[in-house]
Swiss-Prot record:
Pfam families: PNP_phzG_C, PNPOx_N. Homodimer. FMN binds at residues 49-54, 64-65, 70-71, 93, 128-129, 173, 183. HAMAP family: PdxH. GO terms for molecular function: FMN binding; pyridoxamine phosphate oxidase activity. InterPro entries: Pyridox_Oxase, Pyridox_Oxase_CS, Pyridox_Oxase_N, Pyridoxamine_oxidase_dimer_C, Split_barrel_FMN-bd. Keywords: Flavoprotein, FMN, Oxidoreductase, Pyridoxine biosynthesis. Binds 1 FMN per subunit. Belongs to the pyridoxamine 5'-phosphate oxidase family. This is Pyridoxine/pyridoxamine 5'-phosphate oxidase. The keyword ATP-binding does not apply.
Amino acid sequence: MSDIPLIDLKADPFALFAAWVSDAEKSEPNDPNAMAVATATPDGRPSVRMLLLKGVDERGFVFYTNLESRKGRELLANPHVALLFHWKSLRRQIRIEGPVEAVSAAEADAYFASRSRMSRLGAIASDQSRPLDDRSTFEERLKAVDEKYGDGPIPRPANWSGFRVLPEAIEFWQDRPYRLHDRAVWTRDGNGWNVTRLYP
């Protein structure tokens, strides 16, 4: 019914993820590593926003944030997350669910140092997710931080770090004609994975 290859159930999910991201890097005009990150309060009130994936290995998927932002506070209180990658040009998506753990201070320091100077200054000047009476207030704080550090090193603030998502489930979705889509989910089984194809 279609010449689109079916998802390979024998594939390692991390290898398949890497292959799909590689395809997205060739076809998506902007931010192929963009993902929706859903968190929830302890009583189950969800929130979601777009972030950029900043690292992936056999341990999990890494992103960074202000720990005092809404997502940071929710993850500290309820350390579980759902991620969604959607590549419209490829008609594909990947969903990932699992608990999170904090990245090490060394990992956070290394990534923070790799950011542009203005991004580092902004991380210090911003009370992320807090009310802001006037944009000029933030710009004045940014200027003050800029003057404080000058051309010197800019330290990572204690309230800025990262999380690693430890995947318990990774679902791959491939569009097919007539909404007869192809879906497969890998779920953790000890140190291995169980894989199941799903009805569309």
